[in-house]
Amino acid sequence: MCCRPDTSWEKENRDFYCPECAGAIHWAPVVFARISKAGKCVGEKFASRYYDAMGFGMLMYIGDLLPDIASASCADHTTILPFPLYNTVVFDNPDNAYSVNADGALLYSCSTLGCRKTLEEAICKSSVLTSLRTGDIVAVELSEPCLLSSRSDKEKVVAATFCDNDLFDFKIIW
């Protein structure tokens, strides 16, 4: 479990200009929830009461710093959590799918099946270590971080959809 600073959150779907120190950008798809009720040590039975909306996004990491350095996750504009969020009932339909493409090629796809359970487990685990506050975001990586782009790419277009709606569409520029 790690925390990311607010400056890492990209809210406006802008292109990402890679820092000079980076030779590669890694990424991981995430499902996330907005905390709607403050709490500490939330039990599994009650976790669903602590969030009111969910979404899908991605986390990017400075690849040269992976896997053990916390600063790999602190670069500005590397937390892509698009708003507005979806009502939690949307995640009860396994036909709804999240997909991420890079330069038109499918990188990742998943259904909503099991996402609520995964998030609720994360809410329980994180609330043991830290107090949850209204408005906090809890995100869970759906797969291990892997290479998204490297300096040799010069430019890469990353786009994602959920429920046939565009979530984000931006360029990684080296």
Model-found features: residue ranges?
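Catalytic-core "active-site belt" of small-molecule-metabolizing enzymes
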Residues: 1-134, 146-174
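Aromatic sugar-binding surface patches on proteins
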Residues: 137
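Short acidic beta-strand-loop surface patches of small beta-rich interaction domains
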Residues: 140-145
